[in-house]
A protein has these predicted regions:
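Long, well-structured alpha-helical subdomains associated
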Residues: 114-148
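Active-site scaffold of zinc-dependent metalloenzymes
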Residues: 29-70, 79-86
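Exposed regions on extracellular, virion, or secretory-pathway luminal proteins
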Residues: 9-11, 45-50, 65, 116-125, ...
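A metal-dependent hydrolase signature that marks the N-terminal structural subdomain at the beginning
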Residues: 1-36, 41, 146
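Surface-exposed patches in mature extracellular/periplasmic domains of secreted proteins
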Residues: 15-22, 91-97, 115-126
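Stable alpha-helical elements in mature extracytoplasmic
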Residues: 2-5, 71-75, 79, 100-103, ...
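Catalytic Zn2+-binding segment of zinc metalloproteases
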Residues: 79-99, 103, 110-116
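Solvent-exposed, acidic/flexible segments
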Residues: 64-76, 93-101, 131, 135
Length: 148
């Protein structure tokens, strides 16, 4: 199924998927912004979470997501946060400015083969995640080693 595929995609990069019931990075639970977050990546100074992608099983759409290709796109987005962090030392490089999530989406499409149309459809109306030519250019620059 899709969950197995998502797990396999992550494991090719040495990353494991961890299912969790609350939004929590290293003991610091945080607010799940408007219940929107279904998966997340923790940027921890001690690298303890470097190879983990978290999936929130308490998200209202989890049951549906777990049975759809959208799950694989979500995981590719989180893997893109990880790749950007490894390249730039942060998930929010200067070059991305206030477009971190859009740039991360572009990165996942351009370098992990995530489905642009499915992402756009799933995240309709969430402006900070909306990709365009500019976010594609920024993602390519980051991939080429320019973090700003």
């Amino acid at each position: 199924g899709w969950y197995t595929l998502a797990t396999n995609v992550a494991s090719t990069m040495g990353v494991q998927i961890e299912q969790t019931m609350e939004f929590n990075c290293g003991g610091q639970s945080g607010e799940n912004p408007s219940g929107f977050v279904a998966a997340y990546y923790c940027q921890m100074p001690d690298r303890s979470q470097r190879n983990v992608v978290h999936i929130l099983t308490t998200h209202p759409d989890w049951t549906q997501t777990a049975r759809s290709p959208w799950l694989v796109d979500m995981v590719k987005h989180e893997l893109s946060h990880r790749s950007i962090m490894i390249s730039c030392g942060t998930t929010q490089p200067t070059i991305a400015a206030d477009r971190t999530e859009a740039v991360t989406n572009s990165y996942s499409v351009l370098f992990f083969g995530a489905d642009r149309d499915r992402i756009t459809n799933q995240q309709q109306g969430v402006a900070e995640y909306a990709m365009d030519a500019s976010s594609d250019q920024l993602a390519t620059a980051i991939h080429d080693g320019n973090c700003g």
